[in-house]
Amino acid sequence: MCFLRRPGAPASWIWWRMLRQVLRRGLQSFCHRLGLCVSRHPVFFLTVPAVLTITFGLSALNRFQPEGDLERLVAPSHSLAKIERSLASSLFPLDQSKSQLYSDLHTPGRYGRVILLSPTGDNILLQAEGILQTHRAVLEMKDGRNSFIGHQLGGVVEVPNSKDQRVKSARAIQITYYLQTYGSATQDLIGEKWENEFCKLIRKLQEEHQELQLYSLASFSLWRDFHKTSILARSKVLVSLVLILTTATLSSSMKDCLRSKPFLGLLGVLTVCISIITAAGIFFITDGKYNSTLLGIPFFAMGHGTKGVFELLSGWRRTKENLPFKDRIADAYSDVMVTYTMTSSLYFITFGMGASPFTNIEAVKVFCQNMCVSILLNYFYIFSFFGSCLVFAGQLEQNRYHSIFCCKIPSAEYLDRKPVWFQTVMSDGHQQTSHHETNPYQHHFIQHFLREHYNEWITNIYVKPFVVILYLIYASFSFMGCLQISDGANIINLLASDSPSVSYAMVQQKYFSNYSPVIGFYVYEPLEYWNSSVQDDLRRLCSGFTAVSWVEQYYQFLKVSNVSANNKSDFISVLQSSFLKKPEFQHFRNDIIFSKAGDESNIIASRLYLVARTSRDKQKEITEVLEKLRPLSLSKSIRFIVFNPSFVFMDHYSLSVTVPVLIAGFGVLLVLILTFFLVIHPLGNFWLILSVTSIELGVLGLMTLWNVDMDCISILCLIYTLNFAIDHCAPLLFTFVLATEHTRTQCIKSSLQDHGTAILQNVTSFLIGLVPLLFVPSNLTFTLFKCLLLTGGCTLLHCFVILPVFLTFFPPSKKHHKKKKRAKRKEREEIECIEIQENPDHVTTV
């Protein structure tokens, strides 16, 4: 190997170039030997993956277990809200609050909830008989203790000019029934049975009372409707597989019965399928629990795996036909597996970072762990199982066997004597091949379309201005969408869209969004409640809220009773002996914790209830309330915490859910920068960074405009977008920067001709496979469909429209290749002239 120093080039440039050449050729040599090994032992590399799939696949069926804790999956794992819940629960145990109206403070436990909605224009308050019948039927249910804790009104119309806010009419009533399970396993089973019967009863009552609309919710409803997505999607996933199999088979076919590879397209998709089954088996063997977010793994793995399949097929077509099939396999591996190894490594790095301890959402972490295993197995199965299939197909081609019927192809003379239909079925393309076209694979319909039609059109000088305008429009909409990103802390985004939970949530949002959930305000340190300055501080903290406070009620009681309690002993004495013994104030006993030291009593902790006035965007406003109250707990003299069960899901959710994609993006950027001087041409990495950034921001902005929130599913799709873009842009870009044609236009044509077929095959199969997801009635699958559709569409747009045009404007320049060729041609002409002068007879003979 010889390296010539370019005039004026520094020595470091020579060493970097040598290092890049050595690394590249080393990787190519390794992949070449790997291809030779597979071609010499195809049975072994076919058998081992099959045995692994059977072993782990059977174990997956035996160990399948769904995840039952939805909060563990989708709520931030490490949040202040969980610490606050523990503190609140230790101060005020849940079983002491079941008889309270405002008891939904720590965690609801087991409960049943129903909304009764009157027809449009009617007053629910006039439907008393139906309400009482529903309530009475619930109270008569057995197998569990219950307590009626009250009702709330929705869609309220007040009496005009009423000072005491009297209610004129209402559209809906909400009733909640709490069960006392006390943490016992037996009681919990009884509570679960009661909830099931409760939901059945509400459905039955709906049939009996057509004049009312009933919407029920129980504590297990969210988990049930979350898991329902997987049940609804089973048949659609199978349809997706059939569509991908069909697309891969058809796109791998040719008229040439010898060189057509329909079964290889089919076997390539099946290779990815069995690798996914093996990964699932490993997941369940390691005590993993299934959840509906894992529904995206087959689509993610298929998008990467089939890319390797189609690239290997394209690499096979680029090899020389006159070589033995084993050498052709080795050459295809040397050509394709270097890039595929790099992209698989980036998949592993990005999803590995998503599975790191920095990820605060358990569903994202579990998904990324499974994706890492799937990528490793995918890579192993592609070069082993599919490689063995390619070996057998190559052997059949070398021995001139039909690619479908596996019979000997007759000679041209024999075919000429047969009917046209027989010639069509058994033709190996000998009539189409001419001395001008030595590569029969050029007749593949996609490659023919790209070479003869598309390449000339996209590089036309009159098309380029329209492509630039198209990209500016694309960038504008993407930027506009990126400015409107909203977090997806609403758990409804992960549920089946036609489920009872979603119906209940929609009605609740419509009629009960005027007030926030009840927020517990916990004072966890002793406080001088009798001090006027402390009283003023409490009033300022509670200003802007509707407060249900024992402190305020006690102050009013003292004022009405004309009793003075300006010191500690009087304040506590009157509180215990008079205030808390009155029937209308007895429910405040559970809100105050007393301690006794000798004859002296102290208040060591207490709680108040706050309700905020909200609008339709209830969730966002509650998050703002939480963010405003927490800093006050540190800056004020009163030490307190605020808590509601919804805080567990909303606490820094936007930060928790965006961290994985930021880490993954940083990982990709870091890897590409670190390898900037190790790849064969640094400009390849530079263009790759720009392309991936453009695609990622495009998907992010467009999905926001398509009403997709930043929940755990969309974040996983954004991580996948990084890798999907690299997977498809990297071969195209590196082929372009290494091309030695005279002009950039010729280089991009050559790149599209080499890799355009594989890219188009894979993206088309990927997008067609997404179509059945559109028919799954689930918000989770809608999000998955939208994000992956944008991922495939933006990648296709960049590979076939934007990059082919922009690469003709910007570096790398191809002039030095042109100068080298001119110098060589001039040198050759001088040598020929010398030969002509010295040997004129020879020239005359020629």
From Swiss-Prot:
Stored Pfam families: Patched (PF02460)
InterPro entries linked to this entry: Patched_domain-protein (IPR051697), PTHD_SSD (IPR003392), SSD (IPR000731)
Cited SUPFAM superfamilies: Multidrug efflux transporter AcrB transmembrane domain
Transmembrane residue ranges: 41-61, 230-250, 265-285, 293-313, 336-356, 373-393, 465-485, 660-680, 686-706, 718-738, 765-785, 787-807
Keywords noted in UniProt: Glycoprotein, Membrane, Transmembrane, Transmembrane helix
Subcellular location: Membrane
Record has Cytoplasm as a keyword: no
Inducers of expression: Induced by TP53.
Main subcellular location of this protein, as a coarse class: membrane
Record-annotated SSD domain positions: 233-392
Glycosylation sites: 762
Role: Could act as a repressor of canonical hedgehog signaling by antagonizing the effects of SMO, as suggested by down-regulation of hedgehog target genes, including GLI1, PTCH1, and PTCH2 in PTCHD4-expressing cells.
Family: Belongs to the patched family.
Name this polypeptide is given: Patched domain-containing protein 4
Gene: PTCHD4
